[in-house]
Amino acid sequence: MTINLSDVYQGYIDCLNSQDWGNLGDYVGAEVSYNGKRIGLDAYRQAREKEFRDPDLHFEVRILVSDQKTVASRLEFDISPSGEFLGLPVNGKRVKFSENVFYEYEGGKIVRVWSVLDKATIAAQIARSWCEAPANKRRTR
């Protein structure tokens, strides 16, 4: 029987969006690798939990392509992180950005993830909002 990875992946996204951490192992392998480094399920879960400290985080699938062992997805985000985000001083500003991510599956579970976040778009939005702010409201470093 062939597994439909598009359906499995949507289940994974639903698991993330509902923050159902106890069931993350149903979708992610115990020895998962992230961007070429083996981190394991516990570290992967902790990273996702940390991302959800931003209360308006929601994974929105815009593009999804799959075959028998690979999923490619473009995710979109519209969030207002406090403080720094990806090393950038977002400080509560609303930012919209994308992530292009590839997943390799074995036995119906994610075993390898390659992720590229559009950090340049976030930086441009921060710079634009800083330039548009009145001089007396600008935060300096």
Task: List each language-model region with its residue ranges.
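C-terminal and inter-domain tail/linker signature
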Residues: 1-141
